Each structure stands twice: as C-alpha cells, then as structure tokens.
UniProtKB/Swiss-Prot annotation:
NCBIfam families: asnA
Enzyme Commission number(s) of this protein: 6.3.1.1
Family, as annotated: Belongs to the class-II aminoacyl-tRNA synthetase family. AsnA subfamily.
GO cellular component terms attached to this protein's record: cytosol
Keywords carried by this UniProt record: Amino-acid biosynthesis, Asparagine biosynthesis, ATP-binding, Cytoplasm, Ligase, Nucleotide-binding
The protein's name in its UniProt record: Aspartate--ammonia ligase
Alphabetized PROSITE patterns for the sequence: AA_TRNA_LIGASE_II
Localisation: Cytoplasm
Species classification: Bacteria, Pseudomonadati, Bacteroidota, Bacteroidia, Bacteroidales
Entry-linked InterPro entries: aa-tRNA-synth_II, aa-tRNA-synth_II/BPL/LPL, AsnA
The organism of origin for this protein: Bacteroides fragilis (strain ATCC 25285 / DSM 2151 / CCUG 4856 / JCM 11019 / LMG 10263 / NCTC 9343 / Onslow / VPI 2553 / EN-2)
Length: 345
C-alpha cells in the first residue's frame, strides 16, 4: 500500500527552475567527488540483463523484476535491473581493475513492487559503485574508512548547495556515527527496526548501521539482504557479524530518518556458501555469477549504491521524491500533495 508523510506547513525553499538547476549541480558535483575519493572510473551500465544468469539483484529476496521477451533471441526473457551489485563485480573482472581502484555508473532501474510514497518510487536512480580490495581489507575498519570517504563527499556537496542557495543551511554533523544493528537493538529493545533508525538518527544526525541481514540476538534481522552479494555473516564491528550496512540521515522536513546508501564488503567464496546455506538457497550456486565466484574468477570487492533522487531531495529540503524525479503516482496522492504545497513533477 502507498503511504504519504504530511509535513506541517510545508513550503518549498526553491521554485521549479531552481530545483532543476540544483538537481543538475548536485549530481555533477557529487559524482566527481565520489570518483576522486574512492578512485572510481565511470562505466556504462545495462538497463536490463538476461534472466537466469544470477546477475540481477534480489534486494530483500522477494521483489519481482520487470521482464520482457526478446524476439531475436527466441523470446528469451530479459529483466530490468533492480541494482547492479553482481554486474559490477563481473565488470571489475572483465576490466582487470587493480586493488584500490574501481568503477561507478549511473544506474536506472524499475522496482514495480515498491510501496509508493515520499521516499519510494517505481523509478530508481543511483550511483552504483564497486572497488577491488585485498583479503586484508575485509574488515570493519576498512569498511568504516570507505564509508567516511563517501560521507566526506556528502559534506562537501552540502556546502556547495549552500553556496548556490544560502537559504538552505548546512545541517549534516561533521562526524558520522557508527553502530551495529545488534547494539541498536539493545539500545532500543522495545522498538521495531525502522523506529530504531529514526531514534538513532534524530540523536546523531548521520548514522551508519552495520550488520544488515544478519540474525540478531532475538533471532530476527534488522532488515533483509539477498545472501549472495553483501557479507553480513563474517565478524565485523566489536566481533559482531556483518561487513555491510546502511547510511542514514535525519530529515528535518519529514521528521524521520532516510536511507541514502546501502553498501558493504562483498561475499567471498566462504561467505557465499555460508549465507546461501543459511537461507536454504543453495540452488543459486548453479548460476553463472555464483560459479564465477566459486571458481575464483571474480575479484574481492566492496561496493554499494547511493540514491541520487533521495540525495537531491535531502539537500534541497524537499518533502517528496516526486519533487525531484518524474514517475507515476496514485491519483489520490497527487491530489493530497497539491493540497500540501508539494509539487510533483
């Protein structure tokens, strides 16, 4: 079901023309900073991939991809990508990228099973990135170093926005707070995971939650992850499981946390075998991507995605992602947004 968060007395700080210019400037500035921080080369990415190769991402493992038949391939099915986590790792191998360097791309996707609302659209645009690492890099300290570099690019971009539009005051804290999902559960034991995220983000402003996908001490997961890209079972922060996480910011307009990036150190052979066994999905090991990984023809890597529209939405103090990107929305939501001074593109 769709949802709509209704901020009180919302008034956009920018008109439509200023908004479009702001979107352009943010996207250009941030991707250059991201590229230089992580030493990433821009590459061209697919909008769709062949079904049955194990290349498309399953996200939480339940989302259905948009698919269509290809006439010239005997009606073989293609799937519109959800994200490019596995494709990027294959590309690192094909491009023979050295450790310490990587790639990024403008990723466009369709997620038809999304619950539409202020933060969720059918259309997804993000910077998908992947970087080759060594076995010695597969630890929580290295994960935190990479996350802090990404956050540094975010801080610089926020100041650039302030230079363009002085009415938009910087609000990001200079330091990002790290916490494991188990520590977060113990801090707020009576809350649901999303409410924990809101509480910790309201306190610190910017938070990276480590260990997304691993089982916590209550037997539950903070959130789901497909078992074949992020490593969420190897020991990480404070000897707790997980070498991945989510970067979240406190949004003053919506008065809640928003997830800007999901990322992590990717599974090696041992973590892949362990995680697919835990999830009873060992049949995946017969797919092309998984065979490449098991045969040691893919590099060790770290990677993730950074939401472009959400980042712009945060910087420009917008109440709805539809003020940043063009998509399809329920008619009732459009009417309500108009009444709330939220102008959907």
């Amino acid at each position: 079901m769709s949802y709509l968060i209704k901020p009180q007395n919302y008034k956009p700080l920018l008109d439509l023309k200023q908004t479009e210019l702001g979107i352009k400037q943010i996207k250009e500035f941030f991707q250059l900073n991201l590229s230089s921080e992580l030493r990433l080369r821009r590459v061209t990415a697919p909008l769709f991939v062949l079904k049955g190769m194990g290349i498309n991402d399953d996200l939480n493992g339940i989302e259905r991809p948009v698919s269509f038949p290809i006439k010239d391939l005997g009606d073989a099915q293609a799937e519109v990508v959800h994200s490019l986590a596995k494709w990027k790792r294959l590309t690192l191998a094909d491009y023979h990228i050295e450790p310490g360097y990587g790639i990024y791309t403008d990723m466009n996707a369709i997620r038809s099973d999304e619950e539409l609302g202020n933060l969720h659209s059918l259309y997804v645009d993000q910077w998908d990135w992947e970087r080759v690492i060594t076995a010695e890099d597969r630890n929580a300290d290295f994960l935190k170093e990479i996350v802090n570099r990404i956050y540094a690019a975010m801080i610089r971009t926020e100041y650039m926005v302030y230079e363009m539009y002085p009415q938009i005051k910087p609000c990001l804290p200079q330091k990002l707070h790290f916490i494991h999902s188990e520590e977060l559960r113990q801090l707020y034991p009576d809350m649901e995971p999303k409410c924990r995220e809101h509480a910790i983000c309201k306190k610190y402003g910017a938070v990276f939650i480590i260990g997304i996908g691993c089982k916590l001490s209550d037997g539950k997961k903070h959130d789901g992850r497909a078992p074949d890209y992020d490593d969420y079972t190897s020991k990480g922060l404070n000897d707790l499981p997980g070498l991945n996480g989510d970067l979240l910011l406190w949004d003053d307009v919506l008065q809640r946390s928003i997830e800007l990036s999901s990322m992590g150190i990717r599974v090696d052979k041992e973590a892949l075998l362990r995680q697919v066994k835990q999830e009873n999905q060992e049949q995946r090991l017969e797919l092309y991507f998984h065979k490449r990984l098991l045969n040691d023809t893919l590099p060790l890597s770290i990677g993730g995605g950074i939401g472009q529209s959400r980042l712009c939405m945060f910087y420009l103090r917008k109440a709805h992602i539809g003020e940043i990107q063009a998509s399809i929305w329920p008619e009732e939501m459009r009417r309500e947004c108009t009444a709330l001074n939220i102008h959907l593109i």
